[in-house]
């Protein structure tokens, strides 16, 4: 625990209400709802949310490698903070890779959040279509050459 103390102390020193393992969800109409609501469309749990008037901080602790950080997770948590805490206009977010002492930062404002939500809705619509039709179009990536078990894929071995 001593190894992580400096990171934890710096977060603890940020002013505001601290919410640990904070659960958030929104409906398809982007209205905030209970995490377990049957009407939820998307939900997530933020490791730490700090609310300080019109500003918020969102932190997600990681123990793995920082080689491929997923900033999308930060964006989604920030968007849900804007819905659950309408007074918040700016979110500073971070993936904190504890073991590697690396921090990936991002900042979001509530201005233009409709465009970010539209992007998420498009991504979900693609997934919904794949689930509904059991169609999963192949997409080449770095695993195709040596790691993909689907040998009949057009990209296998690329």
Regions found by a protein language model. Name each.
Residues 1-158:
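RecB-family 4Fe-4S metal-dependent nuclease core
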């Amino acid at each position: 625990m001593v190894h992580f103390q400096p990171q934890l102390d710096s977060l603890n020193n940020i002013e505001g209400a601290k919410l640990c393992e904070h659960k958030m969800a929104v409906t398809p109409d982007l209205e905030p709802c209970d995490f377990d609501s049957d009407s939820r469309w998307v939900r997530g749990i933020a490791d730490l949310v700090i609310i300080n008037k019109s500003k918020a901080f969102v932190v997600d602790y990681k123990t793995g490698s920082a080689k491929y950080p997923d900033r999308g997770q930060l964006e989604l948590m920030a968007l849900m903070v804007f819905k659950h805490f309408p007074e918040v206009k700016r979110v500073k977010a971070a993936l904190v890779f504890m073991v590697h002492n690396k921090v990936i930062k991002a900042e979001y404002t509530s201005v233009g959040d409709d465009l970010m939500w539209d992007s998420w809705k498009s991504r979900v619509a693609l997934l919904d279509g794949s689930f509904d039709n059991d169609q999963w179009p192949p997409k080449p990536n770095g695993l195709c050459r040596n790691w993909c078990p689907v040998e009949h894929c057009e990209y296998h071995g690329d």
